[in-house]
Amino acid sequence: REKLAIFLDTQKNSGGAYQELIYMIDRLDSLYKGEIEIVIISNSTDLQINIKGKKFTTYYLRMNFFERHIAFLRNYDPTIRRLKKYFFFKNKFENLLKKLNIDLVYFTGPSQYSMYLEDTDFIITIPDVSHRENLEFPEWTKSSEFLRRDEILSKSAVKAIAVITNARIIKEKISSFYSVEKDRIYVINHRPSIGVANFENFDSSTSEKIKTKYNLPKKYIFYPAMYLPHKNHKYVIDTIKILNEKFNKDISAVFCGSDKGYLNKIKKYSEEINQKKKIFFLDFVEDEYLPYLYLNSQALVMPTFSGPTNIPPWEAFKLKIPVFYSDIHNIRNVYKDCVYYIDPFNPASLAEGIVDIIDNKQKKSNLLKKGNDLLNSIDENKEFGQFLEIVKKRRKIKDTWEFKN
């Protein structure tokens, strides 16, 4: 068995990134337990992975600034790179991997720790290259964030034995921006988070409890996303104003997600245009509550500028909730005719779409069926089989030159 270390530096409240890594760990363990031994390496003592009652062996790695800088220099400083065999500080990350007899490391996102590996092969997930596409958003380009993101990808993507992403359109961009061979980039589609994927039976009492807990309105559109400029919350608030004033539809909006310093501005804007009573701001929501927030809504709306793929549409397909999604970056190649496409610059397009779906039950029914069919058409085992293919390919090549003592 190959010993795979899954490296985690993602917080639970990071939304889709955390849900995706949990799903990946669960599927890899379920499908390839006999061929891959999984251990977790985390830089946080608070992050304990417990999936379906199973706890994974977890090792804690915390590197201070000096230790990280040393690891970086060992790889990228020309002088240190030549001298490190003879004298220099050791690489704390590599030392731990050698101690644990790790064969391969999997980074579930673009982690700076991927730049610190010297001798251990690794796989990395790159969910998007939005910082190269939308330079106007501060969270991607200001305060040196663009340079930080681009440095990680430019140094790690070409060095990884494989890159995993979520759509062919992203694969093409990774190859173009970072000169990665397309044969080394694998596409594994998003899937619903485990809480939604495992949801089976609607419980009325639980639903009422959640309505009371969050003081939910009777009719609302749902947008689960961190509070960041590129998520386009302002657009949804404008849509609610149009729905209520132009179309006389008594509909609210429910947001949920972690605040990244932008929430107060969104709240202030909702007050300025007299929509405060129609906008409900929730924090990060626990997994068991999430399905009910979908099921009690009129629709999922995602006027985002990022991705272009995201997890919530797949969750809505599973729960048979209509999806409104930004018509950006050739996203139609991914979601096909399973979502109602909207112009993320024009709130009226979302307002008109919501009215159209509410008033046209047949159109809504067709949309729900197509979304659920698309979700069910994806061969999950085949897609995740690519991961085992990567592991076996690496082992096959190593067997041509490696001698077992």
Model-derived features with residue positions:
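Carbohydrate transferase catalytic cores enriched for Leloir-type hexosyltransferases
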Residues: R1-N405
